[in-house]
Curated annotation (Swiss-Prot):
Function: Catalyzes the dephosphorylation of undecaprenyl diphosphate (UPP). Confers resistance to bacitracin.
Gene behind this protein: uppP
Protein name: Undecaprenyl-diphosphatase
Extra facts: Bacitracin is thought to be involved in the inhibition of peptidoglycan synthesis by sequestering undecaprenyl diphosphate, thereby reducing the pool of lipid carrier available.
Membrane-spanning intervals of the chain: 48-68, 92-112, 119-139, 155-175, 196-216, 225-245, 255-275
Length: 276
């Protein structure tokens, strides 16, 4: 394992950590970076590259689990009231998270092979980036015209299910899970922070499940020679995601979704021009 290969692992881990939970599409960015670094450089087989992506995604998942550790313990009944809303009898439940997960989980299971075969390209990512940006701009426009639910514990079952339906849009590479669900939550009456909190918590089980299935699928591609590459990528993804998630949650109610939408449109247009 050369220093150059470890540098590539670090870059890929950083890209994953920066984009996994920001509403800019980590899958889209990884497809772009994959074309530039992994495939063009022939660093590893396609199977091994897929396993690497799963490993660095697990680094990002661990970061979010740490940020939301109190909430997770509360959901599991291991920690009592952590907010004033819970003192008043309002509380986000595991059932609400579950109903939010169902739509995307079912569609993802049914169309996984089709999505992998036909939608994982730079062109489809560019389309997803622009389409998702339009949804985000619409969400911010709607948000200015209604009073929003400002805490996670006041989310209704109806809102949880509807946000889950919006998550189905993220099955299109480039659309972004957080972009679609935060936008959906805002359109449905949540403020940006509550929508982001629900998005990140809801993402953990579905991402862990998908990562586990993918890791099992590509298990034969793992080898001891690649372990340093995988470890560097995992650590970089974890550290960067830990910083990004905390920073994003602190600012999202102030900056809204417009800056991310502008970035997505610019990147999407550039990619489409390159593909012409």
């Amino acid at each position: 394992m050369t220093l150059w290969e470890l540098f590539v692992a670090a870059i890929l881990g950083i890209v994953e950590g920066l984009t996994e939970y920001a509403p800019v599409s980590s899958t889209g960015h990884m497809i772009i970076v994959d074309d530039i670094w992994l495939k063009s450089s022939n660093l590893m087989s396609e199977e091994a590259a897929n396993s690497f992506k799963v490993v660095i995604q697990l680094g990002s998942i661990l970061a979010v689990a740490i940020v939301f550790k109190d909430r997770i313990l509360n959901l599991l009944g291991l920690k009592k009231n952590i907010t004033s809303d819970q003192e008043q009898g309002h509380k986000l439940s595991i059932a609400q998270i579950a109903v939010g997960l169902v739509p995307a989980a079912v569609l993802g299971f049914l169309f996984e092979d089709y999505i992998d075969e036909y939608l994982f390209s730079v062109k489809t990512v560019a389309i997803g980036l622009i389409a998702g940006a339009i949804l985000m701009l619409f969400a911010d426009w709607v948000n200015k015209r209604k009073t929003a639910t400002d805490t996670l514990d006041r989310i209704s079952y109806k809102q949880a299910i509807a946000v889950g339906l919006f998550q189905c849009l993220s099955l299109w590479p480039g659309f972004s899970r957080s972009g679609s669900t935060i936008s959906g939550g805002v359109i449905l009456g949540l403020n940006h922070r509550a929508a982001a909190d629900f998005t990140f918590i809801m993402a953990m089980p579905i991402m862990m499940g998908a990562s586990f299935l993918s890791l099992v699928k590509h298990w034969d591609s793992l080898s001891s020679d690649l372990m340093p590459f995988f470890i560097v990528g995992f650590i970089c993804a974890f550290v960067v995601a830990l910083f990004v998630v905390r920073f994003f949650l602190r600012l999202i109610n102030k900056i809204k979704l417009v800056p991310f939408a502008i970035y997505r449109i610019i990147l999407g247009v550039i990619l489409l021009l390159i593909m012409m």
